[in-house]
Amino acid sequence: MAAIKPITTYKGKIVPLFNDNIDTDQIIPKVHLKRISKSGFGPFAFDEWRYLPDGSDNPDFNPNKPQYKGASILITGDNFGCGSSREHAAWALKDYGFHIIIAGSFSDIFYMNCTKNAMLPIVLEKNAREHLAKYVEIEVDLPNQTVSSPDKSFHFEIDETWKNKLVNGLDDIAITLQYESLIEKYEKSL
């Protein structure tokens, strides 16, 4: 009963953005939070860094560079997703095309928002992130908790609850429905 697309192994193109303390307002400025659905936020992700004042692409912003176009794995700095607890930041990154974000650390709420939106947040040390950023593509194996370049693998930690949800494609509703018979039994006992 998968409610979201399961993540087991994933191979994707990377883009490095090694800034520390990227907050949710930098990910999706509050001026763009007027939508009522989860989609349509991608064009506004990193809006103030991504575009020049005239609206054209900023050629110095890594995700705009030709070698990083189509990247689905973001490798970034420490304390990613800090600031206000807007879930729109996760929606914007997902809508932009990211499936995996590798950082030195995450805001707790942002980390949870990623997992709730079928994105895998991975915490790795700086030397591992710098090594992985040298490659065009890397591979993530969630069941074995590894991130691999062609020549090296790095182990990462993830809470078993989040891992189970992502590997099995379960959102909160799907998890609740797994206990439907127990819930009904309890309700009848009242």
Curated annotation (Swiss-Prot):
Protein known as: 3-isopropylmalate dehydratase small subunit
GO biological process: L-leucine biosynthetic process
This protein's UniProt keywords: Amino-acid biosynthesis, Branched-chain amino acid biosynthesis, Leucine biosynthesis, Lyase
The keyword Electron transport appears for this protein: no
Domain of life: Bacteria
This protein's record includes keyword Amino-acid biosynthesis: yes
Coiled coil: none
Catalyzed chemical reaction(s): (2R,3S)-3-isopropylmalate = (2S)-2-isopropylmalate
Broad class of enzyme this protein falls into: lyase
Phylogenetic placement of the source organism: Bacteria, Bacillati, Bacillota, Bacilli, Bacillales
Gene: leuD
InterPro entries the UniProt entry points to: 3-IsopropMal_deHydase_ssu, Aconitase/3IPM_dehydase_swvl, AconitaseA/IPMdHydase_ssu_swvl, IPMI_Swivel, LeuD
Organism (species): Staphylococcus aureus (strain MRSA252)
